[in-house]
């Protein structure tokens, strides 16, 4: 006969009163959100089998990890790869063997973040293109390379860049305004090419700016 385990105490969290610490057979077992207690029908005196307890512990670890990741994504939009890498870092630091090693737990957290729309590479790419070096100036080529390094698919990057949010011509003009006093035409063109701009476009705009000086 399978052994049952009794819920002998439930205490509200001190740091987070919306979370409760659950004690099984007078020993701390796990913590859950209050809504999870209701969903799982956990109350004082409830009895559960071992597989139930394991399910609750998974839900507990999932809830804490998901909340941490959620708060992290609220700081600014993130790419799916950025989130996956960050998740690996914080789970590797966990004191829990289960959290450190469970691929299922990590996959569940990522799946929830994506399904709820908190991770969306297209939205991230648009945010990145709209906000990266807006005053300093940046080439489409460099934006594409940076987004590739963040794990965004090239098809998504191309689609976003083709929306015309940023144009190389306008970006070059920004850089010329900032760098003109320090560089002659040749050095300024070389600098622009190193930044990923087309040589012909850079040369034409630099020469045009010289004529108007």
Stretch-by-stretch model annotation:
Residues 1-213:
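An alpha-helical, amphipathic repeat domain used for nucleic-acid recognition
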């Amino acid at each position: 006969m399978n052994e049952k385990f009794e819920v002998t105490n439930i205490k509200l969290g001190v740091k987070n009163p919306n979370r409760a610490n659950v004690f099984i057979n007078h020993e701390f077992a796990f913590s859950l959100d209050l809504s999870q207690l209701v969903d799982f029908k956990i109350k004082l005196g409830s009895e559960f089998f071992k597989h139930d307890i394991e399910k609750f512990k998974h839900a507990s670890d999932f809830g804490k990890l998901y909340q941490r990741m959620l708060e992290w994504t609220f700081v600014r939009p993130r790419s799916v790869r950025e989130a996956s890498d960050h998740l690996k870092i914080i789970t590797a630091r966990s004191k829990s063997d289960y959290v450190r090693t469970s691929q299922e737990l990590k996959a569940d957290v990522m799946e929830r973040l994506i399904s709820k729309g908190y991770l969306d590479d297209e939205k991230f790419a648009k945010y990145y293109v709209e906000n990266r070096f807006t005053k300093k100036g940046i080439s489409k080529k460099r934006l594409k390379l940076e987004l590739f390094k963040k794990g965004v698919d090239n098809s998504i990057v191309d689609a976003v860049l083709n929306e015309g949010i940023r144009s190389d011509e306008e970006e070059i003009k920004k850089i010329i305004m900032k760098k003109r006093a320090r560089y002659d035409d040749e050095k300024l063109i070389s600098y622009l090419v190193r930044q990923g701009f087309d040589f012909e476009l850079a040369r034409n705009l630099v020469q045009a700016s010289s004529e108007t000086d």
